């Protein structure tokens, strides 16, 4: 059995978008990523647009992610072939003057986009867009991006965890749950907005010092109104509403590297005090 045949080889997964890196990670060098068991290289072309292609040079299949960027062109590390906008080969250094670039020298690019401070790839023809977060266009909210991490867990297992609320009293007693409240609250499943499907519920949480900093409330116990929604294939949006009017919106993203390994990142939107610099808050303050 391979490390992709249980999940990643399913053809339907090729037609969805996956977050593979932060936009800030694509600055001066190409970046290699593995998605659904296949290796890709992503870089910025001369227009600063994100381009992605299989991570192998069509000449001798050396990884293009080992190359470098020259004036927006990706130069291979092995023989110096250069690829410009749209993955087209623009230079074969060993060829004599006047010799045209052969058509097979061009890269077969995949769909690439930037949204929410992240780089997204879709290996096949997209059947749907990148998950919508309307708050991203709302000037009352600001966004925080964190690092993209590599986890030894399947994307399905991670998504299951993000949707599960029965572990809150045991794992998240300082943020999402209380040790003394182990019963799962009554929830109703149904379609939410923007293509998400999920549920809403209320949860009591102990308002410790960290929670008081995040919520702006001094009460020892708070009631949070939470809405959690799933978006195909591995995206979860969780909205936390406080009685003060403060909202936290989390977009939790699992990207399958293979059947047992995933990339994980999350994005947070908040409508709190803009006079407090983001650098003065730890990532834990956002949740």
Residue ranges and their predicted role:
Residues 2-12, 19-143:
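Rieske [2Fe-2S] iron-sulfur-binding domain
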Residues 12-13, 26, 35, 105, ...:
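A generic structural signal for short, non-catalytic loop/turn and secondary-structure boundary residues
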Residues 12-15, 245-247:
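Short coil-to-beta-strand transition motifs
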Residues 16, 81, 166-168:
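Short non-domain terminal segments
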Residues 49, 127-287:
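C-terminal catalytic domain of Rieske-type non-heme iron oxygenases
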